[in-house]
Amino acid sequence: MNIKNSLILIISTIFVLSMINGGLTSDPTCVGAPDGQVYLFSSWDFQGERYVYNISQGYLSLPDGFRNNIQSFVSGADVCFVKWYPSEQYQITAGESHRNYAALTNFGQRMDAIIPGNCSNIVCSPK
């Protein structure tokens, strides 16, 4: 076997193994969030349970499994991530993604809600 064939075999093996292990699906471009949607994940690296938020939903108090548990996300829209008490807000833009959002800012472990548009649109917390 010559060097060229050996390299082709090695590269093909790496490619196949990465597909089997899900390595290629961890890329946010593969996960893909369509325009107007945000994918929220309960595990880092775009894994675990996935919640699909659509901006047509307006204000959303996160469901129990995701409240204080956003580990990674992919955004196809401008949205505001919110923590009500004490008040914190993070502006997220379309095309933004984080593999380990909880570790990066620790905010994923405190997040309560998501609001479409800019954080400046927030007037007060819901009662």
From Swiss-Prot:
Residues 1-25 form the signal peptide. GO terms for biological process: spore germination; sporulation resulting in formation of a cellular spore. Glycans are attached at N54, N118. One of its GO terms (cellular component) is extracellular region. It is found in: Secreted. The keyword Nucleotidyltransferase does not apply. Keywords: Glycoprotein, Secreted, Signal, Sporulation. Belongs to the Dictyostelium gerABC family. This is Spore germination protein 1. It comes from Dictyostelium discoideum (Social amoeba).
